[in-house]
Swiss-Prot record:
Subunit and interaction comment: Influenza RNA polymerase is composed of three subunits: PB1, PB2 and PA. Interacts (via N-terminus) with PB1 (via C-terminus). Interacts with nucleoprotein NP (via N-terminus). Interacts (via N-terminus) with host MAVS (via N-terminus); this interaction inhibits host innate immune response.
Classification via Pfam families: Flu_PB2_1st, Flu_PB2_2nd, Flu_PB2_3rd, Flu_PB2_4th, Flu_PB2_5th, Flu_PB2_6th, Flu_PB2_7th
Protein's name in the database: Polymerase basic protein 2
Keyword Protein transport among UniProt keywords: no
Residues of the site described as Mammalian adaptation: 627
GO CC annotations on file: host cell mitochondrion; host cell nucleus; virion component
Organism: Influenza A virus (strain A/X-31 H3N2)
Family from the record: Belongs to the influenza viruses PB2 family.
Subcellular localization: Virion; Host nucleus; Host mitochondrion
Length: 759
């Protein structure tokens, strides 16, 4: 206050005012400050005094031929004086106005294509809805966000090659366009930009916006998808927020969202299969998201989410070095520890073997709805500062930190036995056992933790065991803060290893991720996810499993038929029959299987009893481990549509309906495909026509290898012998004729010879 009074006093004297307004600036330091270097020191002032001049703009000489010397009002538009130090002319701002009104019109067809990202942004804002403004404290945390809606996901190098190819196709320099997306984009853009007059540099800049993901590390308190980030300045301030619903979606956000859903579904499914890693890879390679191969998206998309990271690690890609526990991302910010196995006793006197981290460490914990700073020593929580959206989110973070601290009072707070299992029915590791236990009910944990009086620190308050805030007391070491904890900003990626149970370790052997960390949240994907792997058939429920299993048999019938007669055990073990087993009542599975296998063996032994439709229908039942029993069945039960439905052993039913005339199969009323080969019993005619050029020598001879299908016969050399599977499921030995002349007689003799060879 004193200084302000003093200044007011000074200003009231006329001499002060005169000195400040009239004195010239002749101090060398000041002159230097404003004249050294090319960088403009006061752009606003410079602009003002430039524009006060008559001709502040310079232009190419050619402009004098395109613009009149004076406008309609008789004002001069350009000066006859040359610009000092260049051969350009001095032009008045009025010339710009004249040009905008009367200058040549160019073709605007390319503008929406080049400035696509801008045009789309305008549309989104036009159709977006802004809601009320709320004044409240904003817990913002810095997150790495995508600031550029509507982009493809090319790497900088890939994009550079595409841009060079589109904008400067004749420039020298090796450009290799390999990925499918590169080729598609290049073709599309070349067509769009034919005869484009916009400067190539501008086109290149705009293409870069469309092709490359741009991320920034920004403070955010709400949605993080790019259509929210583009209006960040409109939706959240320091103490206010405005509700906003985007007026459109962009593909890059949809890809991110669908990728997370696909990855979660795949990891959950792989975790319960016999070889999780192999299954996961098989599924990633056979899945498409929005028509693009999932593995291509994984290579390009920087999304960091537990399931996505597991898929990336399985593919040998680098991932972030932070680790996950209880749905929070932990990043160690200081300290270090060594790990040692230790046995501890729970409150229920159950022994747990845990890996104890010995040493002082500090971590940041970042979750979707809460963040925290954790300081801990060996099996002791020193301090936990949490901030979160609501009481529930704050409680989640506290539970995770307390379990992670491995404190004795946490382990002693366990009531009852710990026997949580994962989806594959395997026991969880001790740390996850503890986590699940307290996530179900943390009352005892919070009560046993202990409270302490707290000092009044700005921006921090205490929290009591019942989760109510307090300014006097708080649970030991725990404080609630108004400020969020920033996400880890580095984009550094590290090499990791993955074991067959999908546990991911860094090079020091620390576990960064495991399937237990994958969220159980279900969502609906924005883009179509196509899982081609049989392991994902069950994602759409039992009906889909049934239809898909039969579709698979029909599509692969040629190979299935050969295996059925030659190597049935291998056929029964095919993974494509795995999902089907979940539809068959557990108690009777083995009996069904034994019954079908016996039936099939009789078909192989007794000639002429081969029945294509019946084999297709019963085959999936034979895949379960068989139990020998004398039971006979006329129908099998499958659990679909919420109840048991029946498949008749002989004949059609609503579940399995094969039309012999059209060779079309419908399963539960859905089309399951058409059989390409003739399943009727009278196939001798067809076979004899196909066997032209082959001499039938007699019964199957094992020395000549496994039976070929009729289609494979064409590969035989003249005089070569082979076993062939013919329509009735019987195998005969044939030889390819050395001379072509006798072909005609083959078709007549074939029919007789087949009958003889068989009988």
């Amino acid at each position: 206050m004193e200084r302000i009074k003093e200044l007011r006093n000074l200003m009231s004297q006329s001499r002060t005012r005169e000195i400040l307004t009239k004195t010239t600036v002749d101090h060398m330091a000041i002159i230097k400050k404003f004249t050294s270097g090319r960088q403009e020191k006061n752009p606003a002032l410079r602009m003002k005094w430039m524009m006060a001049m008559k001709y502040p703009i310079t232009a190419d000489k050619r402009i004098t031929e395109m613009i009149p010397e004076r406008n309609e009002q008789g004002q001069t538009l350009w000066s006859k004086m040359n610009d000092a130090g260049s051969d350009r002319v001095m032009v008045s701002p009025l010339a710009v106005t004249w040009w905008n009104r009367n200058g040549p019109m160019t073709n605007t067809v390319h503008y929406p294509k080049i400035y696509k990202t801008y045009f789309e942004r305008v549309e989104r804002l036009k159709h977006g809805t802004f809601g009320p403004v709320h004044f409240r404290n904003q817990v913002k945390i810095r997150r790495r966000v995508d600031i550029n809606p509507g982009h493809a996901d090319l790497s900088a190098k890939e994009a550079q090659d595409v841009i060079m190819e589109v904008v400067f196709p004749n420039e020298v320099g090796a450009r290799i366009l390999t990925s499918e997306s590169q080729l598609t984009i290049t073709k599309e853009k070349k067509e769009e930009l034919q005869d484009c007059k916009i400067s190539p540099l501008m086109v290149a800049y705009m293409l870069e916006r469309e092709l490359v993901r741009k991320t920034r590390f920004l403070p955010v308190a709400g949605g993080t998808s790019s259509v929210y980030i583009e209006v960040l300045h409109l939706t959240q301030g320091t103490c206010w927020e405005q509700m906003y619903t985007p007026g459109g979606e962009v593909r890059n956000d949809d890809v991110d969202q669908s990728l997370i859903i696909a990855a979660r579904n795949i990891v959950r499914r792989a975790a319960v299969s016999a070889d999780p890693l192999a299954s996961l890879l098989e599924m990633c390679h056979s899945t498409q998201i929005g028509g693009i191969r999932m593995v291509d998206i994984l290579r390009q998309n920087p999304t960091e989410e537990q399931a996505v990271d597991i898929c990336k690690a399985a593919m040998g890609l680098r991932i972030s070095s932070s680790f996950s526990f209880g749905g929070f991302t932990f990043k160690r910010t200081s300290g270090s520890s060594v790990k040692r196995e230790e046995e501890v006793l729970t409150g229920n006197l159950q022994t747990l073997k845990i890996r104890v981290h010995e040493g002082y460490e500090e971590f940041t914990m970042v979750g979707r709805r809460a963040t925290a700073i954790l300081r801990k020593a060996t099996r002791r929580l020193i301090q936990l500062i949490v901030s979160g959206r609501d009481e529930q989110s704050i409680a989640e973070a506290i539970i995770v930190a307390m379990v992670f601290s491995q404190e004795d009072c946490m382990i002693k707070a366990v009531r009852g036995d710990l026997n949580f299992v994962n989806r594959a029915n395997q026991r969880l590791n001790p740390m996850h056992q503890l986590l699940r236990h307290f996530q179900k009910d943390a009352k005892v944990l919070f009560q046993n933790w202990g409270v302490e009086p707290i000092d009044n620190v700005m921006g921090m308050i205490g929290i009591l065991p019942d989760m109510t805030p307090s300014i006097e007391m708080s649970m030991r070491g725990v404080r609630i803060s108004k400020m969020g904890v920033d996400e880890y900003s580095s984009t550094e990626r590290v090499v990791v290893s993955i074991d067959r149970f999908l546990r991911i370790r860094d090079q020091r052997g620390n576990v960064l991720l495991s399937p237990e960390e994958v969220s159980e949240t279900q969502g609906t994907e924005k883009l179509t996810i196509t899982y081609s792997s049989s392991m994902m058939w069950e994602i759409n429920g039992p009906e889909s499993v049934l239809v898909n299993t039969y579709q698979w048999i029909i599509r692969n019938w040629e190979t299935v038929k050969i295996q059925w007669s030659q190597n049935p055990t291998m056929l029964y073990n095919k993974m494509e029959f795995e999902p089907f087993q979940s539809l068959v009542p557990k108690a009777i599975r083995g009996q069904y299987s034994g019954f079908v296998r016996t039936l099939f063996q009789q078909m192989r032994d007794v000639l002429g009893t081969f029945d294509t439709a019946q084999i297709i229908k019963l085959l999936p039942f034979a895949a379960a481990p068989p139990k020998q029993s004398r039971m006979q069945f006329s129908s099998f039960t499958v659990n679909v549509r919420g109840s048991g439905m029946r498949i008749l052993v002989r004949g059609n039913s609503p579940v399995f309906n094969y039309n012999k005339a059209t060779k079309r199969l419908t399963v539960l009323g859905k089309d399951a495909g058409t059989l390409t080969e003739d399943p009727d019993e009278g196939t001798a005619g067809v076979e004899s026509a196909v066997l032209r050029g082959f001499l039938i020598l007699g019964k199957e001879d094992k020395r000549y290898g496994p039976a070929l299908s009729i289609n494979e016969l064409s590969n035989l050399a003249k005089g070569e012998k082979a076993n062939v599977l013919i329509g009735q499921g019987d195998v005969v030995l044939v030889m390819k004729r050395k001379r072509d002349s006798s072909i005609l007689t083959d078709s007549q003799t074939a029919t007789k010879r087949i009958r003889m060879a068989i009988n």
